[in-house]
C-alpha cells in the first residue's frame, strides 16, 4: 500500500508544492500501442488520505474484502533516519478501522 496520496513538506520541497502520487498519475502517458495511460480513478476520486478521517481506508478495505483480499502491505518511507508519510497509517491504527 502506497501512502503517498497526501502532501508533506518534504515532497513540497523536493518535487514542488502540492506533490503527491496523483501528480505522477495525472502526467502518465502511453509508452506503446494498447498502453492505456493515464489511468484516472473512477469518478475523479483523487482522494487525500488525510482529508476524510478514515473514510478512504474503510472504503478501500471494504473493496478489498469484496474481492477476496484480506490484508495490506504498507510501504514505509525513511529518509536520513526520519520516517515520512506515516500520518495516514497512524490515523488508521488509532481509529481501529
Show the residue positions of the predicted features.
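Glycan-processing catalytic domains of CAZymes
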Residues: 1-97
